[in-house]
Amino acid sequence: MFTLTKALEKALLQHFIYMKVNIAYAINKPFPFFEALRDNSFITERMYKESLEACQNLVPLSKVVHNILTSLEQTFHPSVLLTLFSKVNLREYPSLVAIFRSFRNVGYTYEEKNRPPLTLLEDLANPAEGCSLQTLLPPPRPQISLPSHLSSAPRVCDPRATAQPIIEILDEQPSPSPRAVPLLGCIQEGKTTPVSSRDHQRKDKEDSREMPHSPSGPESVVKDDSPAANDLEMAREVPCTPANKKARRKKRPNWSNSKRRRQKKKPRQDEMMGVASPGHGVQEKLKAVSRRTLWKDDSSTNVKEVTKTQRTRMRRAQTSNSQEISKEASKTSGRKRPSTARRTTQVPEKTKNDAVDFSPTLPVTCGKAKGTLFQEKLKQGASKKCIQNEAGDWLTVKEFLNEGGRATSKDWKGVIRCNGETLRHLEQKGLLFFTSKSKPQKKGA
């Protein structure tokens, strides 16, 4: 019998602490989780009643379960896992199945070399309880007896074993040829038929004849009535039987020959179409080339040939990109030309602005009237006499508008000009600053 080691018990405890929250959320109803822990004396009657009262007081069930698991952590024993992952709990709480598998994987890491992985927690059950992990897990399959010349080859004993041995076998034998991958055996309808490579069949024909096809001993016969095992057997029938491989090898040339015949016929038809209509001949030839089957290697499914259609597509993409680049360049060059023309038209305006000296006195015009504007007086208000005409008389803004024939204008800043530009335009540019009383003529009206 297998004895529990401290390392395995410590690993199970650490995993139990790690999975407490997941277990708490997997329990979605109090019964039968609380009752199973109470009946197996893992929690006291007092804790059982307090937990039920907490659930009645609308405390979240996951929090109550987490508190119970925390108390079990202090007095942890692997037998707690047997009660937690019993058949009843796994049926009532389906979310526990994935958690149970994680605990089983922890046991696999600490299993012994000569023991199957499914009997790791064999002695964890209490005999008085009458349950063990053997009732939860399927029994391991017996090993298939092989000839002496195949004893050094890797063996597959259990389809439900971990994936690590299978990965090691694949790493040791990477080539898919029949010499590098010996066929260990085939399972069909409850019978086993061990098959070796072609070299071993030629050397040891007598040994293969002596081996029975339907032995009755437990070592060579593997039977499993479970549906999962039958599915695995049916899935493995196709790659194991050499007859199916031969049939596939025979079918491949027929399929490829029929395809090749079609390919030979299609180019002839395309050539005939090309003579009739030379405009569409190139397109039809490209379609025929794209339709032909690509040659594939038997050892890998990677495509070994690049069709001409892909090359033509690449060339078209390159030409389209070059055309787009040329169009963009022409657009950018076309955009720059009107900007230069605008700059040439704006040059005399800048010379006008540069000639103006924005001193306290500005030459202003309003229609035919001309005068000089004094900014310091204008800041006091538009009703002040701030403009001096050519005769030397001082005028207000309204009087200057009357003299220029623009008395009806309400926007005096848009009428009075200084060197071709209105005072409002100069004010917006920040070249002039006036008082906040912009329209005093309204007050006079």
From Swiss-Prot:
Induction: Up-regulated after infection with M.tuberculosis. SUPFAM superfamilies: SAND domain-like (SSF63763). It is found in: Nucleus. May act as a transcription factor. Plays a role in the innate immunity against intracellular pathogens. Required for resistance to M.tuberculosis and L.monocytogenes. Promotes apoptosis of infected cells. A motif (Nuclear localization signal) lies at residues 251-266. Keywords: Apoptosis, DNA-binding, Immunity, Innate immunity, Nucleus, Phosphoprotein, Transcription, Transcription regulation. Disulfide bonds: none annotated. The gene is Sp110. This is Sp110 nuclear body protein. The lineage of its organism: Eukaryota, Metazoa, Chordata, Craniata, Vertebrata. Residues 197-212 have a biased composition (Basic and acidic residues). GO terms for molecular function: DNA binding. It comes from the Eukaryota. Residues 245-267 have a biased composition (Basic residues). It comes from Mus musculus. Residues 1-108 form the HSR domain.
